[in-house]
Each structure stands twice: as C-alpha cells, then as structure tokens.
C-alpha cells in the first residue's frame, strides 16, 4: 500500500503518471519505441511507446513456437488523467486590483464542491528552448499552495440549502496578493532550474495537495486524491509486470496495458485515437 500511496503522491498530472510508469517499465527491462522510427520486434521481449508524454501503451510478446499464436491475452486499459481544473493560456488574473487568481476551466467529470477550502497546487509540463532545440519537462510547484474558498456563511445564509457553483466565476484559485506575488513563469523557471525567458509554453493543472491515507477502525478504507483514475493505472501497471513472469502460466501469453488521456476522446492521445485503433494482438 505504501508504494501505491507514493505513486499517487508522485503523479499530480497525467504527464507525471506516464513518466512514473515509464520508469517502472524500464526498470523491468522494457524497451521504449519511437512512433516515428521503424522498429523490429522480437518474441520474449517487452516494449512500450508514449505519445505526447501523456499516454502510454506497453506490450509483451511471448515466446511461441514458430507458426503458433499466443495461447491467451492479458489486456488492460485505464486513463492517466484525473478530473481537475486546467489553467487557461492567459492563466493569471487580478480581482479587485489586489487578489491574484488563476484563470481556469473544468477538465473532466468533476465534483466541484470537493475542491473548496483545501490546499491546492499546480503541476504539469513546460516547453522551453535549449541550445536551439525544443525540450519538454514536467514541473510540480508543490511548494506553492493556493485555495478555492467558500464565502462565509454570513454572506450566503442559504449555503446549506444547496449551491450551484459556476466554475468560471465562483471557483478561481487564489494564489496570492499582487504586491507580494512574483510572476508565475518565474516560479516555474526557478522550479525547473531554467531561465524564465527560455520558456515557450506550459500546460498546467490544479491538483489537491492532500495525501492518501487509510481510514476506518481497521484501516479497511482508503481515501485520497486522483483515485480516478490513478488507482486503475497503478493496478494495470502491477498486473502487467506480474504477467511478465517466467512460469508456465505466463510464458506463452501476450500482455498489453494502455494508459490513455481523455478517456473516450478523439484527440491524438485519447481512447479512440490511432494508437489504440491500430494496435493489434
């Protein structure tokens, strides 16, 4: 369970999730393929390919006698992203001339009220220039804490009768006061260890800083952020690694696990994209 909690804590965004899955696969002896480079596959080997840094597909080719198909298939799929707030391109705005807030939009099927009155932070991916090349890097501004606040009960006496939140006007994360607030890109650059003017773009999300924990009198319950859908990503990874065993039950079976972005989406990393469409087993 400790490893699972660590995985959740280390994966505030889909980019971090794929990065951590990739590390685990490489440690297990898997080889990374590039979609743009022709490759040759060998039986008995394990491979994986990533797309956009947010989706990953891994597969194992069993050793079979020539002319024979695998005796079975182990196939699993999950999505690497979680419902959250995505920061818009013009991501910083001021309210009443003093409060610095994030300009965000809904991402995924969110339960809006669960984001109120709890410590939040920002993470994602940046693109920057290095020696004339475009480089991507994941970032986690975990030292920054922001918050989406409820109004005081005095200001809305009907609060406990049910409130419909407008995510565009009622749920902008507050990150500081204008007189004390450094530029967001400077915070990103300092965290990434690069020059601020080398950053060309960022893809950032708001995430909950709360940690996973066991609950209940016998610790039989589990709670934490991003369980949708990182619990399935972790389960799929562990199942895939277990399927690479050397026993008789595993040696002639193919295995495949898929971590995609925007489940059901038709974008280049979604469930209905060409990466999945052209995967045959």
Describe the predicted segments one by one.
Residues 1-281:
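N-terminal hydrophobic/helix-forming segments and targeting peptides
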